[in-house]
Amino acid sequence: MATIDLDGPALAPPKGEVSNLDDPPNQNCLAYTVLILCAVITTICFLLRAYGRVYLLKKFQTEEILTTLAYGNYWGAAYATFKMVDTPGYFVHQWNVRLKDVIPTNYWILIFGVCYSFVLPFLKIAILVEWCRLFVPKGTRTKSIFWWGCMVIGFVQATSNTAIVVALNMQCNPHEAIWDFRIPGAKCWDLHKLQVASATIHLCCDIAIFLLPQQVIWKLKMSWKKRMGVSVIFGLGLLACVSAAVRLAVTVKYGKAADALYALAPLVFWATAEMTCGFFIVCVPCIPKILKETGVIRNIKRAFGMSTAPTNPNTADRYAKSGTKGSQLSSTGPKSYYKLDEDGVPLGTLKGSESTEYLRGNVNNGQGITRTTQIKITQDNRSTSDSEGHAAFPASQKPWGV
């Protein structure tokens, strides 16, 4: 058996090229930028969803479990990508890599592929489960085409990726031969067809997930503008379609490349971007709730000089109108506080006794004031009546319950 020079180049250099095994040219700075950026975006999206769903909405459902599992596997894949920065490096020609350095590279490629094959189905099934909660009422699920569509896509994702993970770990016998080519008598099969099949399945599922909710959204009973906004939010799945399509293209190119290590870099980048897009899509529905609860929208409006007053006529606007009708009310008692009906308007302060007609709702459709109630508060505990017949109440029996 011929001996293998493990310290020699992994590929014979082309004519006019000389192997540089000690300090090969690379683009590791670009790799760090792409990988760190994807990791930061993924982490921010995961934390935003956790804050919006678990902290604000007090919900920890199946979607949160799946998203957490996906995030854990994402870092398994990310760890493998960072390890490949050291050996062999990104955009390094194979003739500039020692043959022995291919062994750990093959190992980290296997780890990345397995984790990647867990991340995407976890995320996509989480998205589908959440959409079923939003768009399909209980008791009507088996009658809904949308629900069955979600079930079919989820089933395809679960079964196909389980099979892919099994196949990745059974591509060679013995198992160690997957990454260590030095093992004698090993039997392996071509992995490229499996990689292309995986990329094709994910692209088809991404397109189906992108199109699936559009018909349901445009049948919702809401204004055209709101339907457009909801459609855009759920249409962000187009990002996943683009990244999956490019990933499929670079996968096909990778299988045909003679310089496989050099062609590995774009494949890793686009697969990582595809996972990041998945986390972004999972996070987006939680952002409006977070912006509302944290007051970000209110602060943005103030920064641009826009009004932050509520626009619901059943609350503050109705009160403002009642204050312009010319009713002159007075009080000798302390300030009173009130709470409007449940429209999210904060407590306000009334200086003096004022009309409470706005609490009754817009009964006469804005046709004028039908009754005005005046309250006078005295400083003692006796129930009295003034000369104008206004009702007075002891401090311990305030009718507004404060």
From Swiss-Prot:
Organism this protein belongs to? Gibberella zeae (strain ATCC MYA-4620 / CBS 123657 / FGSC 9075 / NRRL 31084 / PH-1)
Q: Which residues are glycosylated?
A: N381
Residue ranges annotated as compositionally biased, kind Polar residues, are: 324-334
Q: Where is this region: Disordered?
A: 312-335, 378-402
| Gene (UniProt) | FGR2
Give the record's pathway. Secondary metabolite biosynthesis
Q: In which family does this protein belong, per the annotation? A: Belongs to the SAT4 family.
UniProt protein name: Fugralins biosynthesis cluster protein 2
Per UniProt, what is the membrane topology? Multi-pass membrane protein
